[in-house]
């Protein structure tokens, strides 16, 4: 008769021993893993022992998807494995390969704080006009002005009109005193070029032809008298330019008066520049109303 001490010893369950003996074949070894395909599913059965020495059966089901890849990628998958992985099955081995999402590397020039905005001297000058066009007052060179072609056509038409004998040719400019002496020596005013010429009398208000006055509207606030002089001078000689300015800001009020010497030049200025795009605005050029003389 067995003693009572033997009855108190822990023994494995009879059902566990039967299952383990059926799976291991009474050899005590772990059976190899198996793989079964059922349509689009792949069932992988694996065996392992836990910390207590019990045999565990792990069944993993995978869904097989067929994807079209590039030819180079398909060739790489057919490469033979080498080293410790030469006996592995096709595909990644979870013991040596970790499949995860793609990680995109973003390089930054400033490692400490990439979002910090440092004081860049070029950014400080971005709000200032370093380059200013002489035609449209934009932030670009005069040679790259979008209105350059339109002004060239106007200058070409004026040259053709001047060559045909029409009035309005500008008078010859006086000689430059600095060009009279190239040696750099002092020349007395009486000995300079043009000293013996007789001065011309200035025309009085009654002699001024106010019928050759035009009114220009829709000007920008940055417009100056020199800009109007450069724009209207090719059309004929100008006797006076009046640009209306604000007495506090000294900026243009948007209109000006141009007095031409000849009425034909004023009419041609209205025909050529009325509707012309200047400084992102469309100019309106018309005849000015005559002033009332007392």
Swiss-Prot record:
Ranges of residues in domain RRM: 212-290
Endoplasmic reticulum as UniProt keyword: no
Subcellular location: Cytoplasm
Keywords from the UniProt entry: Cytoplasm, Initiation factor, Protein biosynthesis, RNA-binding
Signal sequence range: none
Composition skew (Basic and acidic residues), residue ranges: 194-211
SMART domains: RRM
Domain of life: Eukaryota
Record family assignment: Belongs to the eIF-3 subunit G family.
Oligomer status and interactors: Component of the eukaryotic translation initiation factor 3 (eIF-3) complex.
HAMAP family cross-referenced by the UniProt entry: eIF3g
The protein, known as: Eukaryotic translation initiation factor 3 subunit G
Organism: Nematostella vectensis (Starlet sea anemone)
């Amino acid at each position: 008769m067995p003693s009572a001490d033997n009855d108190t010893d822990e023994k494995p369950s009879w059902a566990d021993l039967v299952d383990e003996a059926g799976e291991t074949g009474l050899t005590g070894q772990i059976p190899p893993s198996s793989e079964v395909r059922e349509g689009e599913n792949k069932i992988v059965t694996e065996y392992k022992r836990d910390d207590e020495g019990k045999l565990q059966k792990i069944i993993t089901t995978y869904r097989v998807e067929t994807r079209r890849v590039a030819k180079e990628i398909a060739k790489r998958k057919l490469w033979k494995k080498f080293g410790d992985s030469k006996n592995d099955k096709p595909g990644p081995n979870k013991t040596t390969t970790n499949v995860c999402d793609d990680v995109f590397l973003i390089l930054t020039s400033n490692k400490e704080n990439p979002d910090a905005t440092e004081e860049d001297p070029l950014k400080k000058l971005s709000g200032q006009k370093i380059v200013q066009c002489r035609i449209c007052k934009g932030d670009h060179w005069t040679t790259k002005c979008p209105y350059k072609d339109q002004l060239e056509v106007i200058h070409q038409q004026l040259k053709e009109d001047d060559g045909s004998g029409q009035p309005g040719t500008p008078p010859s400019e006086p000689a430059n005193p600095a060009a009279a002496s190239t040696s750099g020596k002092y020349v007395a005013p009486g000995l300079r070029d043009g000293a013996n010429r007789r001065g011309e009398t200035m025309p009085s208000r009654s002699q001024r032809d106010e019928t050759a006055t035009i009114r220009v509207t829709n000007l920008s606030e940055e417009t100056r008298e020199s800009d109007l002089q450069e724009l209207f001078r090719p059309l004929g000689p100008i006797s006076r330019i009046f640009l209306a300015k604000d007495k506090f800001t000294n900026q243009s009020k948007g209109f000006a008066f141009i007095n031409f010497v000849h009425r034909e030049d004023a009419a041609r200025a209205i025909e050529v520049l009325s509707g012309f795009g200047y400084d992102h605005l469309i100019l309106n050029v018309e005849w000015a109303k005559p002033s009332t003389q007392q």
